Regions:
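Active-site neighborhood of phospho(di)ester-bond hydrolases with catalytic His/Asp-centered motifs
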Residues: 2, 23-31, 50-53, 91-93, ...
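Active-site HxH/HxHxD metal-binding segment of metal-dependent hydrolases
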Residues: 6-84, 162-170
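Aromatic/hydrophobic pocket-lining residues that form the small-molecule binding cavity
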Residues: 4, 35, 131, 135
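Well-ordered beta-strand positions
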Residues: 3, 72, 80, 92, ...
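Conserved beta-strand hairpin/beta-sheet module of binuclear metal-dependent hydrolase folds
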Residues: 1-18, 100-110
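Metallo-beta-lactamase
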Residues: 64, 85-90, 95-173
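Short, flexible loop segments at the rims of nucleotide/cofactor-binding pockets, characterized by
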Residues: 1-4, 27-28, 67, 89-90, ...
Length: 173
C-alpha cells in the first residue's frame, strides 16, 4: 500500500471488501496527509513493515503527525511486496525525504509530480531547486509509465513531459 493517508478505517475497510492483504506500507514522504494512518494499518496487517526515507524523520510535528516507520529505504532500493517490485527513486523538493516508486508501468509520485503541476516547496524541508532537479530527472526516465500522484487524477509521464509547465521548465534547465 502506498501513502494510506490519515483515515485508516476507511482504507482497511476497502482492503477487506476486496479480499486483499496489506504486505507493506510504502510512504512517499512524511507529511500527515500521507502517513497518518500508517501505524494503525500496519498493526491491523500483522505488523507489516512501514517504509520511509530518512530525509523526513526530522519534520516538524505539525507536518508529520508523529511519523511511524519500521524500515528505511533510499535511492536504488527495490522493495518486494508479494509479487510486486517497487524501485525507489529519491526525489527531494516537496520534502527532503520525498521518493517516487516505480512498479512495472506505474509510477507513484506522492507530492513530487501531479497532473499538470507539482508539489509545494514552501514547507520546512522543501526546496524549489531540488524540485526542479527531481522533475527533470523524472522527465528523463525512459518509457511512459502511468503516474499515480498523491493528489488528483492519474496521468502519464508522456503527458506531463508535454503539458506540465513545471516539468517543461525543469527540462529546459
Amino acid at each position: 500500500m502506498v501513502d494510506p493517508g490519515y483515515e485508516p478505517n476507511t482504507v482497511l475497510s476497502a482492503v477487506a471488501e476486496r479480499g486483499l492483504k496489506v504486505g507493506a506500507v510504502l510512504l512517499t514522504h512524511g507529511h500527515f496527509d500521507h502517513v497518518g494512518g500508517a501505524k494503525e494499518i500496519s498493526k491491523a496487517s500483522g505488523s507489516c513493515p512501514v517504509y520511509l526515507n530518512d530525509g523526513d524523520l526530522e519534520l516538524p510535528s505539525r507536518l508529520s503527525c508523529g511519523i511511524y516507520r519500521t524500515a528505511a529505504y533510499s535511492e536504488g532500493d527495490v522493495i518486494t511486496v508479494g509479487e510486486a517490485e517497487f524501485a525507489v527513486m529519491q526525489t527531494p523538493g516537496h520534502s527532503m525525504g520525498s521518493v517516487c516508486l516505480l512498479c512495472g508501468g506505474l509510477l507513484f509520485t506522492g507530492d513530487t509530480l501531479f497532473y499538470r503541476s507539482c508539489g509545494r516547496t514552501d514547507f520546512p524541508g522543501g526546496s524549489p531547486k531540488l524540485m526542479r532537479q527531481s522533475l527533470a530527472r523524472l522527465a528523463g526516465m525512459p518509457g511512459n509509465p502511468t503516474v499515480l500522484p498523491g493528489h488528483g487524477p492519474a496521468t502519464t509521464l508522456g503527458h506531463e513531459r508535454e503539458t506540465n509547465p513545471y516539468m517543461t521548465k525543469a527540462m529546459r534547465g
